[in-house]
Amino acid sequence: MKRTLLAAALMAAAGSASAVGIGVRGGTTGIGGDFGIGIAPTLSARFGFSGLNYNRNIHDTDVDYDGRLQLRNFSALLDFSPVGPFRLTGGIVNADNRLNVTGRPSNGTYTINGHTYSSAELGSVDGEIKGKNRVAPYLGIGYGNVSGMGVNFYADLGVILAGGNKTSLSANCGAAIQGTAQCDQIQADAEQERQKLDDKIRGFKVWPVINIGVTIGF
């Protein structure tokens, strides 16, 4: 009898460990999906991708920008479920998340660092904001497992430890003032504008993760 019970328990554990599933999700890392595989009754591995492109106007500094947010996240995670569907999650994320900005003239002029230039003097202003750590740790909690049997709901709440942000901003002088003192002043103003952008995002050290989705397990 004991041998029969032990064999049944081992078979159940093996079945749980070999379960696989796929999930579709959306949230602050974009829209994407996961592939999950059970390793042990309380442990599973998950591999996923999510992405999104989003355009918006930005008016937070002297320059008005057209912004394009690009999210690209590949993840490799371990889910530990000590109590029912609730779990702890950790792993790494290849996080290529960035905001590209292009300055937009107002009535044919740019105002940068408090100085106004015509579009002939200042040809374009382009910048980028992205996380310092391209490959970053992930820590979080969640509900549900992608490798669970049947159709289920799952959710994640956590952070990508991006290590802060990097900013860049370039101002391209018009052909008529290339190599002049005015062009040097434009470059200095662009650096001051970059520092303003940097100051606004200095406190954002992590990327918040809030995702919900649906899984199908086999």
Regions found by a protein language model. Name each.
Residues L77-D79, P85, V151, K205-F218:
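Outer-membrane beta-barrel "beta-signal"
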Residues I22-I37, M149, F204-W207:
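Solvent-exposed loop/turn segments connecting transmembrane beta-strands
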Residues I31-G33, L43, R72-A76, V135-I141, ...:
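Hydrophobic, lipid-facing positions within transmembrane beta-strands of outer-membrane proteins
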Residues I39-L43, F80-G84, N145-S147, F218:
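Outer-membrane beta-barrel strand-turn architecture
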Residues T28-G30, F49-N55, I92-R98, N145, ...:
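Transmembrane beta-strands of outer-membrane beta-barrel pores
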Residues I22-V24, F35, F47, L78, ...:
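Membrane-embedded beta-strand positions of outer-membrane beta-barrel proteins
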